[in-house]
Amino acid sequence: MKKKKTLAALEPYLWLLPSILLMTIFILFPIFEVFRTSMSEVSKAGLVKGFCGFDNFAKVLRGSTFKLVLKNTLVWTIAVVVISTVFGFILALVLNNKFRFRKAVRAIVVFPWATSLIIQAGVWKFIIDKDYGALNTLLMKIGLISSPVNWTPTPQAYFAWEIFVGIFVTVPFVTFCVLSGLQSIDNSYYEAATVDGANYWQKLFKITLPLVKSSLTVSTVLNIIYVFNSFPIIWTITKGDPASRTDTLVTYLYKLAFYKGKSGEAAAVSVIGFLILCLCASIYMVVSLRKEEE
């Protein structure tokens, strides 16, 4: 009997064992390796020479490039997440209403998110090209401009376009996360509010927002992780150039590892990014959960 009880108690863990093994191999072990590499002296060939403590972190933090890259990463993440959340929420409210061709509009909205980021970035890079771009060609044909306009005269302008592309491909994700929350709201809440004389804005802030808060929390946390670690858009459009002026942590550590052969420093940057990401996501989750409890 005791053996049967023991087996019954172990059964759930046996079912979970394959998942635990996969997580260990593909998630936990790589994280351990990155932490180990960040504290090791690594040759350009990728061979670990020995333990070096926090030397790699010191080299990274002392460099002026890292400060610029960190600032770019924070601007990139905050701008894309905040703006895409606002526009995604508004778009979800629109798509939640019944109107003609709603299904077709929803299919069009999801398209930027469903398409490869490399393709999206490549298309936008072509659109804003000064000499052959579709934007200049269109504006010249309709007579709004007489000669091609340089849409990216500075690194800051390039970075602004990258943020725009990031928002463009992220809005659909937020839209459908919020839309799923909106569709789960019982219409009786709105009917009762209408009877009580509530206007649209009162319904929005007293009923809609509180009831979709969980959907917004999930989409925001996933967006922070997704945008913070985004590589294809910036790499396809500028590769972080000129002089790392448009680099984020992900593209910067890629250059350190594969262009300069500094795997130890690249791992240190990766660890710093990982810790920042964990901190930001944890703070947001704690604040959101406390508000829900209140």
Which residues make up each language-model segment?
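A structural signal for multi-pass alpha-helical bundles of membrane permease subunits
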Residues: 4-294
